[in-house]
Amino acid sequence: MCFQHVKAQNTPVLGWRSNFSYTDVKSIVKGNSSLYAATENTIFAIDRAEGSLSKLTKINDLNDVSVGALGLMPDGETLIIGYQNGNIDFVSDSEIKNLSTVKDFETTQSKQFRSITNNSRDIYFAGDLGVVVYNIDRDEITEAYQNLGQEGKPLSINQVLIYNDSIFAATADGLLAASLASNINRQDFNNWERSLPGLAFSNIIQTNFGFFAASDSDLFKRENGNWIFYQNLSSPITHLESLGNEVLVSSETQVLNLTESSLESIYNTEGDGTRINHVLNDGSFIWVATDGLSLQRLIKGASETGIYTLDGPTSDLSYNAELFGSKIYLNTSTFSDLNEENSFSLYNHEDRNWLNIKPSTTGEPIGQIIDLVQLNDEIYLASYDQGLFKTNLAGNSEALISSNSGPVSINSSYNLSSITTDEEGLIWASFYDRESNVFSFDPSNNSWENQSPSHPFARYTTDIFIGPNGDKWLSVDPNEGGGIVVYNETSNRERYLNLNGGQGGLPSNVVTDIELDQDFFVWVATSQGIAFFTNPYGILEGGSLTASVPIFENRLLLRNEYITDIGIDPANRKWFGTKSNGIWLFSETGEELIYHFTINNSPLPSNNILSLAIEPVSGEVLITTDKGAISFRSDATIGTDEHQNVKVYPNPVAPSYTGQIVIEGLVNNAQLKITDVSGKLVKEVRANGSTAIWNGRDLNNARVKSGVYLVFSASQDGLETYVAKIVII
């Protein structure tokens, strides 16, 4: 087995990098020069001559994510993308043309496209709304066949076949056929002939030896105008491809070659859990799209296979991004979405590689991975039902809860809801709906200690945050009262914070994240906005306590916004992820908006932000959404006490360049004065940590003239200085 693999590339300042998962490939199409493969949320291309791989994403100007179907224009070069929301892109070497007619159509029905069929100058888009016909010459949608179900009810169309003067359709309720004659109204369901109603059909094709259609694991053939049962396979059929005298048939577990006289298995998954989704013969190789093993290339009759994939996490649905050193970890479960996916992902900023790890113990996979920490270069993972484990990069794991000590499993589950670490090297763990609900674990001697507070709401802890003085902040399940229980196991003091004034004054009792900034303020994200506590050391001192909320544009910052996660960057600026409104970046105090990224003004794949993590050396912000992960490289990086390896780029600056000029390697939070060669001040800039940007404009916001400009950089006290030169052409 050989691998063709492309790893992540370095990202420019203020640039974006996609981090989609390429593990599960759903479909493939063959162009003249490239193969195109679609995952759930993105596309990649394989150069048929060189075998090189490249990404197609919103970063390089696609208009959407979540792919429904792929197709090709008659030229064999222009890729057609039908998205799950009804949007359509036509992608050629020279341009990307968008058609949003279906996307913009107002309906409560799903608009997902499921297949694309090319017929001369007409392109047929089949999907949940029915069939949409796009005419190439008129560059518009010319027909739409909706509500083709019995009695005119909505009916999902999975694939269409054009043969002579007729159109056939594989649908969720049988097979349909209608005449393409100009005098036939195909928008009227009465003009469609129905066969085998009650059966859901996924595919329909025409070969030199007949028509075939697939329903679940059954293959049907059309003879003398009637559809009859032909063959049953051992697993559901996922795709049919006609090769004239042969048919490639893929089921969930095997690929078969069907001729007029035989049915031969040419590839199977050997019970490894891999699901086959699609198959394609490009004349030289057979390509198999799978869940689990990305895109495989087969040579008929040979045992050797090749795997083609790009670097990325194990899943597009990743939670709880956590930074430890230069590594960011993602897990595939969260308290509100437990699943048995037994893997987690690690992104290493030093070598810019993703590593996907499948942990197991005594040969059994570990699922419901809800949290991760790294301590002394060891990885510890929390499985909601199976407990705490120490694991390595190979996935070999050791259970750390024994029957002799520590938490107790009830009904085959520990209900381990979160873990974190303290400055003394202990791991703190919460156990949901348990009388003993908070424990500390000492990895040096594998010992557990019950540290449960007395407050009844602590029983329903979903997350733990440890304050700068060691106080434990326990986020409480909103379904059990919500809010925060703060306690200190040494002083035995505790306090419950909620939305009531004087008792915390939180915007909401639904607490989603708690973070500490560089001023030792504790920021709390809730379903109704953001708040912060300026003195976390005094939380347990008693007295009235109400959280502060920044004021932005004469109102409470992000009031009524569902905040999902908080990130603090090296400039102490605040990043806020939201459930439906993208991601916001505010100044240190929260009073100045710097960026607000949504799907409409950025490559974000979704406005539903699940989590974020900031790597301070590069300034890269990893953002996970419900439709995949993406990174934005901000201009805030961790600073040092002196200038180190100062770089200015681009330099020289071309006349056509309109982006930001980046100056990095500066002393922490340097003050920069930019002058012309005569010493006239052009611009003053302050670095965010060790990085500053200049837009090439002067104090009056006019673009500077061609020439040489000097950058004088100095530390806050003026003792550490540096001079750089920028050439504007």
Language model features with spans:
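C-terminal segment of classical bacterial N-terminal signal peptides
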Residues: M1-K7
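Carboxylate-rich, polar loop motifs that coordinate divalent cations or form catalytic acidic clusters
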Residues: K7-N645, L681
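Solvent-exposed serine/threonine-rich low-complexity stretches and specific carbohydrate-binding patches
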Residues: K58, K683-S690
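A generic structural motif
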Residues: L148, R686-G689, V727
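Glycine-centered coil/turn sites that cap beta-strands in beta-rich domains
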Residues: D641-K673, T691-W694
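Short, glycine-anchored, charge-dense loop/turn motifs used at functional sites
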Residues: Q671-V682, Y709
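Short, surface-exposed loop/turn motifs with a glycine/proline- and acidic-biased composition
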Residues: A687-G718
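Edge beta-strands of extracellular beta-sandwich domains
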Residues: T721-I726
